[in-house]
Amino acid sequence: MQQARVRLAGTSPDDLDDICDDVRDIADTTGVNLSGPIPLPTKTLEIPTRKSPDGEGTATWEHWEMRVHKRLIDIDADERALRQLMRIQVPNDVSIEIVLED
């Protein structure tokens, strides 16, 4: 049977956990096997910028960072489960990637 690998990525870990709970509920209602959610390492994107707009004065820096959290879920590729999976309401800051594998 085919497996569907669902990759979730977003800046809010609470939103990711809510979507993982929705996927788990879908797997329970349709009776398909589920493994995960597997938390992947968090990627930290950091951008240092100068505080002063011109080049004068002391070199003081601000550091802006954004953390990207990721989750991985493997689910059996049942047609009913995948149809319900496509209907999940996803927030704007969360991206979902579904790949079918043998």
Curated annotation (Swiss-Prot):
Name listed for the protein in its UniProt record: Small ribosomal subunit protein uS10
Native organism: Haloquadratum walsbyi (strain DSM 16790 / HBSQ001)
A Pfam family it matches: Ribosomal_S10
An example Gene Ontology biological process: translation
Entry keyword set: Ribonucleoprotein, Ribosomal protein
Chain positions covered by the region annotation Disordered: 30-58
InterPro entries: Ribosomal_uS10, Ribosomal_uS10_CS, Ribosomal_uS10_dom, Ribosomal_uS10_dom_sf, Ribosomal_uS10_euk/arc
Transmembrane segments annotated in the record for this chain: none
Ribonucleoprotein as UniProt keyword: yes
The UniProt record lists the keyword Aminoacyl-tRNA synthetase: no
GO molecular function, one term: tRNA binding
Oligomeric and partner information: Part of the 30S ribosomal subunit.
HAMAP family listed in its UniProt record: Ribosomal_uS10
Similarity annotation: Belongs to the universal ribosomal protein uS10 family.
Function: Involved in the binding of tRNA to the ribosomes.
One GO cellular component term noted in the UniProt record for this chain: small ribosomal subunit
